[in-house]
Amino acid sequence: MLHLMIKPGQLSLKQLRQVSRSPVVLSLDPEAIPAIAESAQVVEQVISEGRTVYGINTGFGLLANTKIAPQDLETLQKSIVLSHAAGIGELMSDETVRLMMLLKINSLARGYSGIRLEVIQALIELVNNQIYPCVPKKGSVGASGDLAPLAHMSTVLLGEGQARYNGKIISGLEAMKIAGLEPITLAPKEGLALLNGTQASTAFALEGLFVAEDLFASATVCGAMSVEAALGSRRPFDPRIHRVRGHRTQMDAATAYRHLLDVSSEIGQSHSNCEKVQDPYSLRCQPQVMGACLQQIRSAAEVLEVEANSVSDNPLVFAEDGDIISGGNFHAEPVAMAADNLALAIAEIGSLSERRMALLIDSALSKLPPFLVDNGGVNSGFMIAQVTAAALASENKTLAHPASVDSLPTSANQEDHVSMATFAARRLRDMGENTRGILAVEYLAAAQGLDFRAPLKSSPRIEEARQILREKVPFYDKDRYFAPDIEKANALLQLAVHNRLMPDQLLPSQH
């Protein structure tokens, strides 16, 4: 199991990817403790001096001008958590909640939120005991932060709400007991500090990023397999072509194809002097299209790594100056736009894959048997598998519509512009599943096409990719129940089996 000492503000994408995939044991860097204590002391000083400061002794949103009496401050913190836990729909996965909790811990531990160490440690203990609050997926507009999801997360700290432990749903009170904790009475500012922030949106977006990385790798491998199966030319991957255009990601994508389609391929050698001048765009323009997708992935990764290490609370406590300042770091517009760009990349990866698969089943273009099966007519082969791929590609086109351009005012127009980051990021999982399904169909089709080129072999990496599939799915010699083949190919892609065939340091979370 991964052991991770949190150095606040220094989480890497590689670490975040690991936490998104498996349980973790967290600890807090002792050097972070003084800053946490100092910010909490500033809040205590505000209360002792009787000053009025938003989020500490006032109402929230439109009620920000309502001062709360000292005897009601503890009730205020509990009330904000319980009243804001108003999400709806299916529950987030344990993986998403674990990542969200890590992001919240990382943000609070930077020492700008005025929250006590014991609250942060309680979140750490829940994660370490693999106790994950039950958090509905829907109910956040991404400003003022992810209020509803983070409120559901926080109810467990109060001994309220529900959590999941070993696959079973238990009460928040029982969850705290299992973690060896007593329910927490939140001090002034702490309820708001827990609820304000972009951690739900960012967790969804990071998961989408990691899915996009895996899809990019698999699509590149499947695309190279399709080049071989269709007897496509290698000349479009010549580094000189991409160097004169100048896009770094296009050059990197072309390098990946050359890495896969090396000169040892017998299939490539067999038609090196053929008369065919140009391949269809779905083969020839792969570096250009996939390079553009890689640019979106890298750009989103840069934004999300910053956001994962950010302080998105409000108000913020600057202990060195004794100041508490209201701002808008909770507005998740950067996350929303990054997620929108990832959606474009995921959709285009799938769209290009579907076109390559359609090319392979077209005997006029690929010079392979119609629908990749012998005895056509009696056998329909990959005919309807391509229809499935087309349906998934079309669905992704609708899902790729930008969410960040939408906004609905909330909280009686006090919060009059919102980011919709949570939906922007949440839909990436569905889009990823669609694109993975398309790639599964292409993977099957490309391997089938390569088998028809026997006894000629491709390059070692392409042959390894083909063999990985053939260990699970045999050659399609005649019509059989097709769905299990797609499911098996899909399962392999979900395991990211192609990542090891790609060049190192290509994708952001590899660094």
Swiss-Prot record:
Assigned keywords, A-Z: Cytoplasm, Histidine metabolism, Lyase
Residue numbers bearing the 2,3-didehydroalanine (Ser) modification: S144
Gene3D superfamilies for this protein: Fumarase/aspartase (Central domain) (1.20.200.10), Fumarase/aspartase (N-terminal domain) (1.10.275.10)
Main localization, broad class: cytoplasm
EC code: 4.3.1.3
Post-translational modification note: Contains an active site 4-methylidene-imidazol-5-one (MIO), which is formed autocatalytically by cyclization and dehydration of residues Ala-Ser-Gly.
A GO biological process held by the record: L-histidine catabolic process
Xref: InterPro entries: Aromatic_Lyase, Fumarase/histidase_N, HutH, L-Aspartase-like, Phe/His_NH3-lyase_AS
Keyword Lyase: yes
Metal-binding among keywords: no
Entry similarity comment: Belongs to the PAL/histidase family.
Protein name, as recorded: Histidine ammonia-lyase
Taxon lineage: Bacteria, Pseudomonadati, Pseudomonadota, Gammaproteobacteria, Vibrionales
